[in-house]
Regions:
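Conserved metal-coordinating catalytic motifs of nucleotidyl cyclase and c-di-GMP turnover enzymes
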Residues: 197, 218-221
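Regulatory sensory/coupling modules that transmit signals to nucleotide-handling catalytic cores
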Residues: 1-188
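Conserved long alpha-helical elements within nucleotide-processing catalytic cores of c-di-GMP signaling
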Residues: 192, 202-216, 224-245, 254-258, ...
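Short hydrophobic/aromatic beta-strand micro-patches
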Residues: 263-265
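Short catalytic/binding micro-motifs of nucleotide second-messenger systems
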Residues: 247, 277
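Short, mixed-charge, low-aromatic patches
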Residues: 161-167, 198, 231-237
């Protein structure tokens, strides 16, 4: 039963990888695109060697490629001159995989046991050490850059290599599923939320008011910042939005151009006037 579930995860993760690849290409997220593309390319290794030998190679080099594609400078478009470096990395690792998968010395060195691990039973302790180090690096890097989703995706992508019972089938991962969910959520946020204030935008306001028979609306217009630099004005709007998100309880706040719109659903007029005073 358990093995049949593992077998089914292989094609399921492949489907999510294709979905993540298409979504990231459409949304022009070059980092996620090339990370997922590297996962798809890694599957070719399993056509050249048995599962065990392919796992040894993929468990060491695919996480390295993942980290490399995260830290490389993000390109505006998916395919441009900067992308040639990433394509070259994929070609180089692919050639390396063709050679090392059939290397007895490489497979023997990767299979050596150096210590006992209580919880995990990795296929290779060498690759496991690198996995832990890379995972910790991405968590710290993501916390510093505000991009923790890459650390989460990394952990979900290589769980298979941490447990011996999961090594009997081909490559599967959960990182592509996470990327699909992230891209869908990110698209939703960009459509219905203001970029700077993080408050719902005009589209969200229109959707909110659909079906309302009665409610009170209030508006706060922010003006007098013409002398400020555009960068400083955005910072100020961001701070105002942060204050309103914390202070406006039981009131829905929306950002429409230079105005903050308040929607009072179940409050009477006197309470609404008092809030806006």
């Amino acid at each position: 039963m358990f093995e049949s579930i593992l077998v089914s995860l292989v094609p399921i993760s492949l489907v999510f990888e294709l979905c993540a690849l298409a979504l990231s290409f459409y949304l022009k997220d070059s980092r996620i695109f090339f990370i997922v593309l590297s996962m798809l390319c890694a599957r070719l290794t399993y056509l050249l060697a048995p599962f065990y030998q392919a796992h040894l190679f993929v468990s060491l080099f695919l996480p390295l490629v993942f980290v490399l594609f995260v830290v490389l400078k993000k390109s505006v478009l998916v395919f441009e001159k900067k992308s040639l470096v990433k394509l070259a990395v994929l070609v180089f690792v692919g050639i390396l995989g063709f050679v090392l998968c059939k290397s007895t010395d490489f497979n023997a060195s990767m299979s050596e046991k150096f210590f006992d691990i209580a919880i995990f039973t990795p296929i290779s302790q060498v690759s496991f050490v690198f996995l832990v180090a890379e995972f910790a690096f991405l968590l710290f890097w993501g916390a510093f850059k505000g991009e923790l989703h890459f650390g989460v995706a990394f952990g979900l992508s290589f769980l298979q290599f941490c447990f011996e019972s999961a090594q009997k089938v081909g490559f599967f991962e959960f990182g592509a599923l996470f990327f699909v969910l992230y891209l869908v959520y990110h698209t939703y946020k960009s459509l219905y939320f203001d970029t700077f204030t993080k408050l719902p935008n005009q589209k969200a306001l229109k959707r909110k008011l659909l079906g309302f028979t009665s409610c009170y609306l209030g508006a706060l217009r922010v003006s007098g910042f013409e002398h400020l630099e555009p960068k400083d004005e955005k910072i100020l709007f961001k701070k105002i939005g942060k204050i309103l998100r914390k202070q406006a309880k039981n009131v829905k706040v929306f950002c429409v151009d230079d105005d903050f719109i308040f929607v009072f659903e179940k409050l009477d007029e006197s309470v609404a006037r008092e809030f806006l005073r």
